[in-house]
């Protein structure tokens, strides 16, 4: 798939949630998101057992590989290594970037949560992160206690030279200002998977149409 950076393409970043994408609908839901053009997928499950997560992550990785889309694992470099996922996403209280890089290697994608802080972002850049995630920008059921962020941080973070992800309460109705402010990806949980499974593909396409209008490097043909 080329260099690490080339794997991170502008567009929709689909994030699973075991409450919205339980085991019996996980694969069909993510497949619909991929069919709709998701450019990155993160497996996030805070409720299943380790053995269940292993099976689900393996199945998701096979699915994502079929679409040539990277799968990242939330907060668990060891699971990412076991299933051969493309990388991990780490929060500020999770495994260190250094330890994750040591385990997964130089070709893994490692994203870092930076909340609303350019200082945290600079630390992540210095540590070798591959993308930076800022948010929450809107009220979020997934992380209701997360500190709010202003779209201005997306614009300012562009100077750091890494792909920028916006997260937190994003829907098809409020994503546009974040893309205009500089988001290369919008990470979406409930705004993608919170409705009927039959609507997921259309929701994904709607996000990417906004990128087609407002992101200079986005192409619907990719």
From Swiss-Prot:
Q: Where does 4-amino-2-methyl-5-(diphosphooxymethyl)pyrimidine bind?
A: 42-46, 74, 113, 143
Binding residues for 2-[(2R,5Z)-2-carboxy-4-methylthiazol-5(2H)-ylidene]ethyl phosphate, per the UniProt record?
140-142, 169
Its UniProt pathway annotation is: Cofactor biosynthesis; thiamine diphosphate biosynthesis; thiamine phosphate from 4-amino-2-methyl-5-diphosphomethylpyrimidine and 4-methyl-5-(2-phosphoethyl)-thiazole: step 1/1
Which keywords does UniProt give here?
Magnesium, Metal-binding, Thiamine biosynthesis, Transferase
Please provide, in alphabetical order, the Gene Ontology terms of the cellular component aspect for this entry: cytoplasm
Molecular function (GO) terms for this protein are: magnesium ion binding; thiamine-phosphate diphosphorylase activity
Record keywords: tRNA processing included? Answer: no
Q: How is the cofactor bound?
A: Binds 1 Mg(2+) ion per subunit.
Which residues are Mg(2+)-binding? Answer: 75, 94
Q: Which cofactor does it need?
A: Mg(2+)
Q: Using the UniProt record, name the top-level EC class of this enzyme in a single word.
A: transferase
Q: What is one process in the GO biological process aspect for this record?
A: thiamine biosynthetic process
Its catalytic activity? 2-[(2R,5Z)-2-carboxy-4-methylthiazol-5(2H)-ylidene]ethyl phosphate + 4-amino-2-methyl-5-(diphosphooxymethyl)pyrimidine + 2 H(+) = thiamine phosphate + CO2 + diphosphate; 2-(2-carboxy-4-methylthiazol-5-yl)ethyl phosphate + 4-amino-2-methyl-5-(diphosphooxymethyl)pyrimidine + 2 H(+) = thiamine phosphate + CO2 + diphosphate; 4-methyl-5-(2-phosphooxyethyl)-thiazole + 4-amino-2-methyl-5-(diphosphooxymethyl)pyrimidine + H(+) = thiamine phosphate + diphosphate
InterPro entries documented for this protein: Aldolase_TIM, ThiamineP_synth_sf, ThiamineP_synth_TenI, TMP_synthase
EC number(s) on record? 2.5.1.3
Work out whether the entry's keyword set contains Transferase: yes
Q: What does this protein do?
A: Condenses 4-methyl-5-(beta-hydroxyethyl)thiazole monophosphate (THZ-P) and 2-methyl-4-amino-5-hydroxymethyl pyrimidine pyrophosphate (HMP-PP) to form thiamine monophosphate (TMP).
Q: Which family does it belong to?
A: Belongs to the thiamine-phosphate synthase family.
What's this protein's name? Thiamine-phosphate synthase
**Source organism per UniProt:** Marinobacter nauticus (strain ATCC 700491 / DSM 11845 / VT8) (Marinobacter aquaeolei)
What gene is behind this protein?
thiE
